[in-house]
A protein has these predicted regions:
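Transmembrane beta-strands of outer-membrane beta-barrel pores
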Residues: 31-37, 73-77, 84-88, 118-122, ...
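Residues that define the transmembrane beta-barrel architecture of outer-membrane proteins
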Residues: 57-63, 95-100, 148-152, 190-194, ...
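Extracellular/periplasmic loop regions
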Residues: 44, 234-347, 359-361, 401-403
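Outer-membrane beta-barrel "beta-signal"
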Residues: 156, 342-344, 405-418
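Outer membrane beta-barrel
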Residues: 63, 68-176, 200, 395
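Transmembrane beta-strand segments of Gram-negative outer membrane beta-barrel proteins
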Residues: 13-46, 76-80, 169-173, 357
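Extracellular loop and loop/strand-boundary signature of outer-membrane beta-barrel proteins
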Residues: 50-55, 87-90, 138-142, 181-184, ...
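Repeated loop/turn-to-beta-strand initiation elements of outer-membrane beta-barrel proteins
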Residues: 74-80, 111-114, 163-169, 202-209, ...
Length: 418
């Protein structure tokens, strides 16, 4: 009898313990101190700190909480992602909570999905740049893996599978409304934009064809592909074409003019993994909306002139204008036209478990300036990630990285996942 009871106890288990729970809560908490060594002779330093004396360096302390809530049961699922930033900088304390994603999904079959709400579309194949990501916010090439805020959309995925060289087709039509309280920063208000993407898995190659139109911005068309040439070597590319693009340019007189032209942007990239677990990511980015050397030189000339006028008259009107929205494209990531991105990372060198050093460089091929960022990533215990990163900026006067507000940036990051 005792033997029988032992056998029954050995093979008894609770089905509820292995069933997938419909609710999930996760995310991470992060602390990220940043130290900047300021370049007090640079033009962008003068533009931002012209009326302040912050010394040779400044410190910034960032606290971040990314929270994910999801529900998945039957044909229905939902996801909410929020991001809270609390920052202590030279200007004081600030905080902001942003709803990154909040959408409902209905999946009545494996071939049909309907999504409604705020979400990221994640179009494009580039790692650091995505010129064909028409319904996504631009990545930060200095940290491409950062979570980003989505847009409110209605999208459908219809998936069809085949036998043969063409394995899969997915049709993804998208509606994107733009009003004063919905996607208000996307473009012109009171417009209902329509876009779409067609995905093909053809000859073991991922191919996307996409478009977006509707009036909030000029119509645009794109294509991308990625293919694993071998198990450790991948190539990818994407192209965006905007036939009626309008670019704001500030000329030497300080007037804002609009240049209209057909804009073509594209990206070519590779990802290669060696036998020793070294990963190389290389991308060339042609930014068709970027500024020419003469246009950037005009902008730098205006800052220099405005700063000299401020020193003589204490009139900062022109400096405030150059630091405002009209010139934002001059001060964003990759403001010019030709860039090379390189990242080299080594997994667990010298048999140090959970340790990944890397080196990243972004090179402006037009003016020769560049950033160089060595980084150390370590996971000492489960769910805890520690990162140390130094970014050094190198460039001559009137070059992109030579005129940044700082010479180098030292950053630590502790992130706990749950």
């Amino acid at each position: 009898m005792a033997s029988g009871l032992t056998a029954q106890e050995e093979y008894t288990f609770d089905l509820s313990e292995i069933e997938k729970k419909p609710f999930h809560f996760g995310g991470y908490l992060e602390f990220r101190p940043v130290f900047l060594d300021l370049d007090r002779d640079s033009l962008l330093y003068n533009l931002r700190f012209y009326d302040l004396d912050e010394g040779e360096s400044i410190a910034e302390y960032n606290f971040n909480a990314l929270l994910d809530f999801s529900y998945d049961k039957g044909i229905f699922s939902a996801k909410i992602r929020t991001n809270t930033d609390i920052t202590k900088s030279f200007s004081g304390w600030s905080h902001e909570t942003t709803l990154y994603e909040a959408f409902l999904s209905v999946k009545p079959s494996l071939s049909f999905h309907l999504d409604f709400g705020k979400k990221r579309m994640k179009w494009g194949k580039g790692y650091a740049f995505n010129p064909a990501a028409f319904i996504d916010r631009a990545k930060n090439p200095n940290d491409p893996d950062l979570a980003l805020e989505g847009f409110v959309v209605i999208s459908v995925d219809y998936i069809k599978s085949f036998k043969g060289k063409l394995r899969t087709i997915t049709l993804t039509p998208v509606l994107l409304p733009v009003y004063d309280h919905i996607n208000s920063d996307f473009g012109e208000w009171n417009k209902l934009n329509f876009g779409g993407k067609v995905y093909f898995l053809l000859y073991d190659t991922d191919i996307d064809i996409m478009f977006l139109s509707g009036g909030s911005g000029p119509a645009r068309y794109g294509i991308d592909f990625s293919r694993n040439m071998t198990s450790n070597f991948e190539i990818h590319a994407e192209l965006a074409y905007i036939p009626d693009y309008s670019k704001k340019v500030i000329d030497q007189s300080g007037s804002v003019i609009e240049e209209n032209y057909a804009n073509t942007s594209y990206l070519l990239g590779i990802r290669y993994l060696t036998r020793s677990n070294t990963t190389f990511i290389i991308e060339y980015f042609k930014n068709g909306s970027g500024y020419t050397p003469s246009e950037m030189d005009d902008f730098y000339f205006l800052i220099e002139q405005a700063y000299e006028d401020y020193l003589l008259t204490e009139d900062d009107t022109q400096l405030n204008f150059l630091a405002g929205g009209e010139s934002q494209a001059y001060r964003t990531f990759a403001p010019m036209q030709d860039y090379l991105y390189l990242r080299i990372s080594q997994k667990e060198p010298w048999d140090i478990l959970y340790f990944v050093p890397s080196l990243t460089s972004i090179i402006n091929l037009t003016d020769g300036s560049f950033s160089l960022a060595p980084e150390l990533l370590y996971n000492p215990v489960t769910n805890l990630e520690l990162r140390a990163k130094i970014t050094v900026l190198v460039g001559k006067d009137r070059s992109e990285f030579g005129e940044k507000q700082n010479d180098f940036r030292l950053e630590f990051r502790g992130r706990y996942y749950f």
